[in-house]
């Protein structure tokens, strides 16, 4: 595809030769002849001189280079759209593999694919054009929506409801028993029955080896368009709003509530029943012990407003120096006190 044709598909203008041929896409460091890449802002303009890419996607502020370019307000998003034109994941053909095992009253929509060794319980409904890859286990009473893809080795526990156009990556477990135990007078732990379920709305993505638990009663809810990374733990009874982003190794204790468009960076931990408001951003490795107001950016453990955390972190790095200064001052004060005392006598 010529660069000009690609730009027309993307709805963006071209600077430079529109007739260069684009055969693929790659990162700025790895791109070579015939490949398109991007940089997100002028902050990374130094890579333009080093790249061997045939053409680039640039924002309007990045200086014009000798490399032909497509101009965009959002280069990363435009690159994603370009990638969709070149890369179409191969979908398996509709059908049921002969090794798949289906329980009673299973309802399959049109053009469903069930891979090898898939095991499906009773009273399961799978929507049209859904794809279930090999070795998945789907318990009783599960509902899976239209065009949802469940990758290999996933487990969907009883009563789980997955919406339309979701993606569940390999190894994820959705709807497993919540971690519910009640202390007894004898000092033991009594298991609380976990009779609830997990409800996942449309266009949610769940990463590899993520775990989303069901509660004792009611349901755990994942809002529409939310993206959950690998190794994320969502505890029983959590309520996650629409279009949230949970990055790798985030852990939510039971009953946590997230508003809309909340971003939790890697390894964030949230204490039980804490509520995090809409559009909040939590920096990596932060600990959230209690509620967070909407629209804030917090960092640290326990989490503080980001600006305060930056100042605190700067002071922490200076603590050895400040401590030594304090010791020096203490010694000087002690010497002054001795001289004063000697003068009085």
UniProtKB/Swiss-Prot annotation:
The keyword Cell division does not apply. The active site is at 236 (proton acceptor). The keyword DNA repair does not apply. Pfam families: Hexapep (PF00132), LpxD (PF04613). This is UDP-3-O-acylglucosamine N-acyltransferase 3. One of its GO terms (biological process) is lipid A biosynthetic process. Keywords: Acyltransferase, Lipid A biosynthesis, Lipid biosynthesis, Lipid metabolism, Repeat, Transferase. Pathway: Bacterial outer membrane biogenesis; LPS lipid A biosynthesis. PANTHER family: UDP-3-O-ACYLGLUCOSAMINE N-ACYLTRANSFERASE, UDP-3-O-ACYLGLUCOSAMINE N-ACYLTRANSFERASE 1, MITOCHONDRIAL-RELATED. Homotrimer. InterPro entries: Hexapep (IPR001451), LpxD (IPR007691), Trimer_LpxA-like_sf (IPR011004), UDP_GlcNAc_AcTrfase_non-rep (IPR020573). Belongs to the transferase hexapeptide repeat family. LpxD subfamily. GO terms for cellular component: carboxysome; membrane. GO terms for molecular function: N-acyltransferase activity; structural constituent of carboxysome shell. Its EC number is 2.3.1.191. NCBIfam families: lipid_A_lpxD (TIGR01853), PRK00892.1 (NF002060). HAMAP family: LpxD.
């Amino acid at each position: 595809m010529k660069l000009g044709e690609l730009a027309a598909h993307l709805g963006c203008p071209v600077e430079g030769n529109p007739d260069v041929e684009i055969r693929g896409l790659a990162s700025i460091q790895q791109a070579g002849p015939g490949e398109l890449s991007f940089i997100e802002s002028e902050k990374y303009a130094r890579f333009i001189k080093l790249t061997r890419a045939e053409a680039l996607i640039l924002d309007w502020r990045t200086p014009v280079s000798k490399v032909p370019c497509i101009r965009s307000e959002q280069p990363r998003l435009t690159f994603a759209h370009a990638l969709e034109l070149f890369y179409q994941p191969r979908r398996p053909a509709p059908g049921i593999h002969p090794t798949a095992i289906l329980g009673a009253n299973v309802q399959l929509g049109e053009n469903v694919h069930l891979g090898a060794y898939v095991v499906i319980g009773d009273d399961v409904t799978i929507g049209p054009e859904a794809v279930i890859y090999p070795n998945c286990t789907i318990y009783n009473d599960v509902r899976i929506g239209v065009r949802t893809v469940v990758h290999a080795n996933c487990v969907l526990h009883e009563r789980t409801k997955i919406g339309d156009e979701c993606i569940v990556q390999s190894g994820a477990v959705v709807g497993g028993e919540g971690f519910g135990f009640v202390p007894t007078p004898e000092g033991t732990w009594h298991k609380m029955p976990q009779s609830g379920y997990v409800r996942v709305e449309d266009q949610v993505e769940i990463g590899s080896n993520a775990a989303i638990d069901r509660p004792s009663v009611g349901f755990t809810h994942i809002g529409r368009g939310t993206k959950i990374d690998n190794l994320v733990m969502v505890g029983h009874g959590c309520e996650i709003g629409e279009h949230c982003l949970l990055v790798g190794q985030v852990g939510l204790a039971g009953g946590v509530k997230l508003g809309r468009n909340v971003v939790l960076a890697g390894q964030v931990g949230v204490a039980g029943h804490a509520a995090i408001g809409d559009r909040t951003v939590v920096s990596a490795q932060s600990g959230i012990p209690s509620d967070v107001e909407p629209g804030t950016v917090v960092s640290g453990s326990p989490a503080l407003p980001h600006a305060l955390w930056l100042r605190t972190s700067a002071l922490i790095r200076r603590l050895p120096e400040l401590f030594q200064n304090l010791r020096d001052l203490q010694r000087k004060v002690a010497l002054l006190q001795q001289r004063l005392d000697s003068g009085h006598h």
